[in-house]
Amino acid sequence: MMENTFDDISWNFSTTNDITISLTYYGQVDKLIHHCDFFSGIKESLKNHITVQFVNDAAPDRGIFEDICKAYKNRFNLKSYTVKQDIGFNNHGCRNLAMLESETHWNWLIDIDVYFKEDLLEAMTNTALENNQFYVFKVRFDHYDNPEDYELFDEKKLLKWVAHPNVWLINKPCFWSTGGYDMEFAGMRHGDKEFFQAIDKKKYEHFLFHPMLEEEYDIHIQMPNRTKSYLNQITEHVGYLQKCVDFVKKRNDNKIRKHKKRLICFDWQRNV
């Protein structure tokens, strides 16, 4: 992999990008309402360039997700989908679905516990993005707010900023150069590393998104509750995980095979 250098990018603010933002939901009603209120309140000129897709990963919430999305459907460009089978952790399958349904070249894939400001959206829509690049983002750690924020990445709490492992500003050709997220990991919290490794590094390079270098743009992880968010997820310690990892790596090393893998293993419907 090429070494990432951040100081040699000439950021151009002369282009306006249409961007689709996709989030997966699994019963986090408060966070869903937060995002709906946030996107409802952004300036109209920005709304014209932003589409938001919520994908309900079969959360058993008695229709609350659908009701909320329908209540907000006229306040911003909103599309919502519901997966019909609860197969456990399926964030990556939902992302495959979102990318298949997206109508824009540029897409921001985030988790529903990611909070951000309008300034960040303005920067993404007003910056000339390079088609041979995809972008990662700083994560703000607020240990007073939530001492358990991503403890596995910073057990000694030495870091102030790291790149989030699952937040991408990425164009469609770059995303599909991976063949999509690997559905072999459905039900397990695994697959971020394999997705990153499957990106065609001969064509695409990753950069930290930082138009002003010293700007305060960041994303904040709000109360992730990672261990209890799915009712029936399989843990990463199941015996066959390593077999899945080995199989996926071998397949993704084959450019032909990785583009023939299944993208969705569930029924779904569009709500809004």
Specify the residue positions occupied by each region the protein language model found.
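C-terminal catalytic/acceptor-binding lobe
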Residues: 186-272
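Short, well-formed alpha-helical segments that are part of the catalytic scaffolds
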Residues: 28-43
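Short aromatic/hydrophobic "clamp" motif used to bind/position activated sugar donors
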Residues: 107
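Conserved catalytic core of nucleotide-sugar-dependent glycosyltransferases
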Residues: 99, 117-184
